């Protein structure tokens, strides 16, 4: 096997915009990494998800096109 073909594996500090700091190891080649979201502030992980009500859109679509039917004969 060849020696020295693997990248250096070093400590990486990932800092989120919410202030959460995560220390991990990586072969990225940087000492710091800045994140927009992490598990501490992402809505999926915090349970603060917003459900979009698409039922109103579907009803509006059906109402708009309910008059059209396949009654056109050729």
Swiss-Prot record:
GTP-binding found in the keyword field: no
Binding site for Zn(2+): 16, 18, 38, 41
A Pfam family hit: Ribosomal_L31
Keyword annotations of the record: Metal-binding, Ribonucleoprotein, Ribosomal protein, RNA-binding, rRNA-binding, Zinc
GO biological process terms, semicolon-separated: translation
GO molecular function, one term: structural constituent of ribosome
Cofactor details (free text): Binds 1 zinc ion per subunit.
A single GO cellular-component term on record: ribonucleoprotein complex
Gene3D superfamilies hit by this protein: Ribosomal protein L31
Cofactors (names): Zn(2+)
Function of the molecule: Binds the 23S rRNA.
Family membership: Belongs to the bacterial ribosomal protein bL31 family. Type A subfamily.
Subunit details: Part of the 50S ribosomal subunit.
Name of the protein this chain belongs to: Large ribosomal subunit protein bL31
Organism: Acinetobacter baylyi (strain ATCC 33305 / BD413 / ADP1)
Organism ancestry: Bacteria, Pseudomonadati, Pseudomonadota, Gammaproteobacteria, Moraxellales
